[in-house]
């Protein structure tokens, strides 16, 4: 959303008010709206549920979202979805009013997005951000998407996981067909990507790690780009890129003017879109798992980080992998490349030093009720229950055995 690394916009956790993107940060939809686009989000936001942080205040004209990081989630503080929500028939916040929907969540988000896109046809160009809750756990899919995986003898969680993915695949297919039927597919860049590696214990390309890990398996994601007549089908680009390269890329395509350009971490990918082998200056990209305890930002500097360039991945201070020769991360080659490891560690420290003053949510007080709960209760004239006090968990060594 910002063209910057999460820590640099205040996001160091997924809950506890630390999921909020700090106010005043220019966003991608704001830039596109200023460039003449209309903007819509359909699905997951997860950058703050309170009013000043919600997407209608961050550049989106059309907003159709669930709360928190997943449908039905609820945590201490403002982060939470509408009470009682499930993957089927969820209550969705549509331009600050809840709508009780019917169907499976992914189908609902795509249907709403396509209805909105159809209404924009012949008007302004549009930016549609479709962020599905699936395949987030719990792994629940429509029955029609589970049968073949059940017949294959898979476990119930794997059945749900793959069923959710196949449902997404079908919805993307519906979207591409609709763009063609509207006659705008040649004018539309369609991007499919995910936000992290898989959380389920399934095939991961022989990469080490999964969601929550700073290893390749936790951070490497698919990135498929489709633009008939502009991008050559079947082209593989092997150059490393990041999610925060999207904002400067969209700025170049849409002739937008990103504000605070000197603070962007991303780089326009347009040269690689034109030529997969275009010259490209190597760079260090930093990953950190975050999610430390309250007040522990500084001492968590070395707790779960990695630095990546085109060929090598430094994991922690003393482990270096050659990702070209060893994509499964089995052989530590730091003794063979001490100077490179030194540079990567120095780059990381510089990055973390710059991130610390931007971690503005570390001491934010927790609200009494989830924001979406309060909005839901008010809209439906429901009584607001007393605040449930969540006691802090005891340190592991002090927990009583059951």
Residue ranges and their predicted role:
Residues 1-316, 323-346, 350, 359-360, ...:
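Formylglycine-dependent sulfatase
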Residues 318, 363-364:
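Acidic carboxylate-rich catalytic motifs and surrounding loops in phosphoryl-/glycosyl-chemistry enzymes
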Residues 353:
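Acidic/polar, glycine-enriched structural segments that form the non-catalytic walls/loops
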Residues 365-371:
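Long, compositionally biased
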């Amino acid at each position: 959303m910002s063209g910057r690394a999460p820590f640099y916009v205040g996001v160091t956790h997924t809950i506890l008010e630390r999921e909020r993107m700090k106010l005043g940060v220019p966003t991608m939809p704001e830039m596109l709206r200023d460039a003449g686009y209309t903007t819509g989000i359909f699905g997951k936001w997860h950058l703050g549920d309170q009013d000043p942080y919600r997407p209608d205040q961050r550049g989106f004209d059309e907003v159709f979202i669930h709360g928190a990081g997943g449908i039905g989630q609820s945590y201490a503080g403002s982060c939470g979805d509408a009470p009682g929500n499930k993957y089927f028939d969820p209550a969705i916040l549509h331009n600050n009013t809840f709508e009780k929907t019917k169907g499976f969540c992914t189908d609902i988000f795509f249907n709403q997005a396509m209805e909105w896109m159809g209404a924009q046809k012949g008007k302004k160009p549009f930016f549609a951000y479709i962020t599905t809750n699936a395949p987030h756990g719990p792994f629940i899919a429509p029955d029609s998407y589970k049968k073949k995986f059940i017949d294959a003898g898979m476990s119930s969680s794997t059945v749900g996981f793959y069923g959710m993915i196949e449902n997404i695949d079908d919805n993307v297919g519906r979207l591409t067909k609709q763009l063609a039927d509207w006659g705008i597919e040649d004018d539309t860049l369609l991007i499919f990507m995910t936000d992290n590696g898989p959380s389920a214990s399934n095939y991961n390309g022989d990469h080490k790690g999964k969601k929550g890990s700073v290893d390749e398996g936790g951070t490497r994601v698919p990135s498929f780009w489709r633009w008939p007549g502009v991008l050559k089908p079947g082209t593989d680009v092997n150059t490393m890129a990041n999610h925060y390269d999207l904002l400067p890329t969209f700025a170049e395509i849409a002739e937008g003017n990103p504000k605070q350009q000197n603070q962007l971490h991303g780089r326009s990918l347009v040269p690689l879109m034109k030529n997969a082998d275009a010259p490209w200056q190597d760079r260090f990209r930093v990953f950190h798992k975050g999610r430390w305890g309250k007040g522990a930002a500084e001492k968590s500097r070395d707790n779960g980080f990695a630095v990546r360039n085109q060929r090598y991945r430094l994991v922690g201070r003393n482990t270096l992998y050659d990702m070209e020769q060893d994509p499964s991360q089995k052989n530590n080659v730091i003794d063979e490349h001490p100077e490179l490891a030194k540079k990567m560690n120095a780059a990381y420290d510089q990055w973390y030093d710059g991130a610390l003053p931007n971690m503005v949510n570390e001491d934010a007080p927790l609200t009494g009720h989830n924001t979406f709960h309060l909005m839901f209760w008010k809209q439906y004239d429901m009584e607001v229950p007393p605040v449930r006090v969540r006691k802090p968990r005891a340190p592991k060594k002090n927990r009583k055995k059951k």
